[in-house]
Amino acid sequence: VFGVGQRTQDIYNADALSEILGKTVITRTFPEIVGREIRRIHQELVPFTQDERDVYQMAMKEFWKMRENYFSSTGNSRKDAMMRLIQQITLLLRISAAPDTVEEYQGSLPTKIRRVVDLAGRFENEIVAIGVRHKVVLDSYKAALEEAFPNRTVFAVTGGTTSFAQRRKLRKTLKESGNGILLCTQQSLPSSVNFEYVNRIIIPEMHYNNAGMSQFYMRFVRYTSTEKKDLYFPIYIGSLESNLMQMVLAKEKLTMFMKGQDADMDEIYAKFGVDYD
């Protein structure tokens, strides 16, 4: 049914597939239900510094030097060889999220973390939500945010360290803060707890598809929301993140088709604030 091409993910036998979906899939998108689109997506392109580029290139070209510091052996050489590429991709994405989380990094505060801090600073009188995927990345951002904003409360939330009851209580305490910063792993917010009063959402570490990320940011974008919601995606220029974003967009085209929306890639680029020219 599906074919993959450069910068595209085409759908073959679309008419037949559409007929099947029309009989089996019943779904409506958020804008269709609320009658308007309140999400505004912004790409924040971040250049590498030389120190950041050096550690990224080391992970690209000399992964064997770094591997044992972050991944344990299975004890089976064949399995280790099969896992090597996946581990390298994982490490490259970790460096793209927070270069200072690897011991080989020799620089100062990474540019992306500084950009996220600057974004949070733009909204000094508003509540800001920041979603990452891994605790080691969260710890790096937490240290930078607490140093930059000693007078703002940073609410750090992970599924492993914060109970469900505490996460439910967070809804009230975050709102009462007035300008607090919610820093969490994206999967840690329970689906039953919504933060519709938060309008600024920053995602410096992406999922492999928009469905995964939307489970996080839709905690803030609610059917009862009345204000625009700004979603920021800081991305290192020339990193694997750029490829990951392209994969997210290609998957989004398929998702939209499954929902009865046959959009082309230019429309999806516009939706996600991407300009590939």
Locate predicted features.
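Conserved phosphate-coordination/catalytic loops
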Residues: 83, 106-114, 132, 161-168, ...
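Short helix-loop-beta junction
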Residues: 145-152
